[in-house]
Amino acid sequence: GIPTLCKNISKNYSFQYDLNSILSRLIYGRILFPSSKLSCYEQSTKLYEQPNFELQHIYRSLDVLAKESDNIQATLYKNSKRIIKRKTGVLYYDCTNYFFDIDSEDGSKQYGVSKEHRPNPIVQMGLFMDMSGIPLAFCINPGNQNEQLSLKPLEQQIMKDFELSKFVVCTDAGLSSESNRKFNNFGERSFITAQSIKKLNNNLKE
């Protein structure tokens, strides 16, 4: 489970804080009272099991969690199969973005096409879900990146880390580039995508 996962991750670093305690509170907080990390820390002191870390440790742990993201996702997927049957025959993929109240670009926070039509720098998030609507894997990319380019790398990660090879990928028209369609028209993979009737050839319209 998560305690064992955090213990194994901690062996590769020299930090002194309890990663499992922090990650547990972040998960509780996201479910019970989704808010900032500061608010999550303040709210966690109201829980029966008191946190054994300081606010600064939450912020420091975020870099570790980001570096270990792929490992965490793969481990959680494998562990989840012991509890429920994961329906991975059909995978749904979509992208969204998040804005930041900052005045200039910084790292992955870049000016791009905001889903909320805001002028702020954004980061892009891509997410795969299984047939039950349970998250499978996600990726974070710069806000100025074409979201079509995010599908293939994350899908390759799923095939490698999750050992999946046979599935149908469902996307909207915005993610259905020719390159993505060709990639998912190979081996035991296939795809379903939305298609504008107006853009179809006349013979297909008929």
List each language-model region with its residue ranges.
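Generic recognition of flexible, low-complexity loop/linker segments
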Residues: 27, 77-82, 111-115, 123-126, ...
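Structured alpha-helical segments in the cores of large, soluble enzyme domains
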Residues: 118-131, 144-159
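Short, solvent-exposed amphipathic alpha-helical segments in soluble enzyme
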Residues: 107-110, 184-186
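Short secondary-structure boundary micro-motifs
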Residues: 13-15, 74-75, 109-112, 151-152, ...
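Dynamic "connector" segments at or just before major functional cores
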Residues: 1-107, 119, 128-139, 144
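Short glycine/serine/threonine-biased micro-segments
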Residues: 110, 124, 131, 141, ...
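An internal, acidic/charged active-site-proximal segment
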Residues: 147-206
